[in-house]
């Protein structure tokens, strides 16, 4: 049997490929500059390591559950809360899906023109309409099956992983190899350069860090496949944290060598990764080659992510949905098994968010920043259910068996779960504050604040409405059944 077990280092590499990407480095550097190095170390120690080990215990305890987080919640609390967990997992992907068309446009704009002008010079109306067309096209294609794209997407994901590591190696090595390379950020040898100013503005950026290191629950299928999970799984998670830490710190230092931390480009979040590869390529004598390879792999990866994120979360929510909480019309399938009305609901919600910026976003750079920050507010909401399940598990820990336990002492375990829950919640709430100068554009500031607050509230309220509709539907069906009973004269 041991020959079929995977080792701790394999688990670490699988998880690393799932949770890490170059975008994590670029987005957080764009918000904090070189001081993000310290932030990475803090978030890893205070949040990511306990998060990953909490997931490990939940996976080990409910090793036969196939529903992931919603199954954990159902086993530790109620079916109703399990439905809300499943709904949250699906609905947080709505802003994520709305962002993908713009990312695809930006990537292929760099391939075609060698810069970010294709999208930045478009009007917001044109960007919104083209993005909507791209999304609707892939929404339709998702109903037809995309097996070929899944294979291509997997290859693109691997290529992106390699490019992210290559970027770090080349950037760190550039001063020693390319004689004309000059480090952009001054005083990078001074420790004070890396110390953040812990003010209110700083704490509004924490949600982006949480967003970057989240997603550890994706490793759930591998915990019980690990040899000696009690010893080897935590070892693998510490290796994972080490790899994430090294890539985050060195990646941020590499960004600081290419871009001046005190004078960051306004389009860094949208175009920073492409510009970085372009600059490195020029210094290493390969021109735009590295940038084009990165743009192609990222573009294909974004297409695959768009297609998968339309289909997979929807199936998780509706494939075995409880009729008590999800109305029949939403569970309805075609003869080919397509969740027709589920796709329609996805299309409506995503289309609204794609078109929403027309009411208050002035340019492409602000659109990318707003959508990225909106995702950093909404996406971590699903992590809350992980920590809730862990707290509830430890309340009744005597009733469950687990090969691996994060913390054996019940009270300490509940404190760890509560810490991660509150940290995530506070980060999401603070992340709602817009990341732009109020004085420069008050109307845009208020638009972003309102949309950042209302989007998660509306999405969650919609999920609370469905059980009410389902109950009405069932009462109506029961009433019709009673009316058909024929009583004898």
UniProtKB/Swiss-Prot annotation:
Membrane topology term: Multi-pass membrane protein
GO molecular function annotations of the record: transmembrane transporter activity
GO terms classed as biological process: amino acid transport
InterPro entries: AA/rel_permease1, APC_superfamily
Keyword set includes Transmembrane: yes
Subcellular location: Cell membrane
Main subcellular location of this protein, as a coarse class: membrane
Knockout consequences: Disruption of the gene leads to strong reduction of aspartate uptake, but only marginally affects glutamate uptake.
GO cellular component terms, A-Z: plasma membrane
Matching Pfam families: AA_permease_2
Keywords of the record: Amino-acid transport, Cell membrane, Membrane, Transmembrane, Transmembrane helix, Transport
Membrane keyword on record: yes
TM ranges: 6-26, 36-56, 91-111, 122-142, 152-172, 195-215, 238-258, 290-310, 342-362, 373-393, 413-433, 449-469
Family under the similarity heading: Belongs to the amino acid-polyamine-organocation (APC) superfamily. Glutamate:GABA antiporter (GGA) (TC 2.A.3.7) family.
Job description of the protein: Involved in aspartate and glutamate uptake. Plays no significant role in the excretion of accumulated glutamate.
Name the UniProt record assigns to this protein: Aspartate/glutamate permease AcaP
Species this protein is from: Lactococcus lactis subsp. cremoris (strain MG1363)
């Amino acid at each position: 049997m041991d020959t079929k077990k995977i080792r701790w280092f394999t688990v670490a590499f699988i998880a690393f490929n799932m949770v890490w990407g170059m975008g994590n480095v670029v987005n957080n550097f764009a918000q904090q500059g070189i001081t993000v190095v310290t932030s990475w170390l803090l978030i890893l120690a205070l949040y990511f390591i306990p998060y990953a080990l909490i997931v490990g215990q939940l996976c080990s305890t409910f090793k036969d559950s196939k529903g992931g987080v919603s199954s954990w919640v159902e086993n530790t609390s109620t079916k109703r809360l399990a439905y809300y967990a499943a709904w949250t997992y699906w609905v947080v992907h709505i802003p994520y899906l709305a962002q993908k068309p713009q990312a695809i446009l930006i990537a292929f704009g760099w391939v075609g023109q060698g810069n970010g002008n294709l999208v930045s010079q478009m009007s917001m109306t044109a960007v919104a309409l083209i993005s909507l067309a791209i999304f609707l096209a892939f929404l339709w294609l998702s109903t037809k099956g995309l097996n070929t794209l899944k294979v291509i997407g997997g290859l693109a994901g691997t290529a992106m992983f390699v490019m992210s590591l290559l970027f770090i190696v080349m950037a760190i090595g550039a001063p020693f190899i390319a004689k004309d390379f000059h480090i952009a950020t001054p005083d990078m040898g001074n420790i004070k350069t890396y110390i953040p100013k812990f003010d209110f503005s700083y704490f509004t950026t924490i949600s982006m860090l949480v967003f970057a290191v989240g997603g550890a629950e994706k490793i759930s299928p591998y915990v019980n496949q690990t040899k000696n999970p009690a010893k080897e799984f935590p070892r693998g998670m510490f290796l994972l944290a080490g790899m994430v830490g090294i890539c985050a710190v060195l990646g941020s230092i590499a960004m600081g060598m290419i871009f001046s931390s005190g004078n960051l480009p306004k389009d860094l979040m949208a175009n920073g990764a492409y510009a970085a590869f372009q600059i490195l390529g020029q210094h290493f004598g390969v021109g735009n080659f590295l940038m084009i390879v990165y743009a192609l792999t990222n573009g294909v990866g974004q297409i695959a992510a768009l297609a998968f994120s339309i289909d997979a979360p929807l199936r998780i929510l509706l494939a075995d949905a409880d009729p008590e909480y999800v109305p029949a019309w939403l569970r309805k399938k075609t003869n080919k098994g397509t969740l027709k009305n589920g796709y329609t609901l996805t299309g409506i919600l995503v289309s609204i968010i794609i078109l929403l910026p027309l009411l208050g976003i002035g340019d492409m750079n602000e659109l990318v920043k707003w959508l990225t920050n909106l995702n950093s507010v909404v996406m971590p909401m699903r992590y809350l259910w992980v920590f809730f399940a862990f707290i509830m598990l430890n309340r009744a820990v005597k009733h469950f068996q687990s090969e691996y336990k994060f913390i054996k002492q019940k009270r300490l375990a509940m404190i760890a779960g509560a810490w991660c829950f509150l940290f995530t919640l506070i980060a999401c709430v603070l992340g709602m504050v817009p990341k732009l100068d109020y004085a420069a554009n008050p109307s845009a500031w208020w638009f972003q604040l309102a949309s950042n607050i209302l989007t998660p509230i509306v999405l969650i309220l919609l999920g609370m409405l469905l059980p009410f509709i389902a109950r009405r539907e069932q009462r109506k069906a029961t009433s019709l059944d009673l009316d058909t009973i024929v009583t004898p004269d």
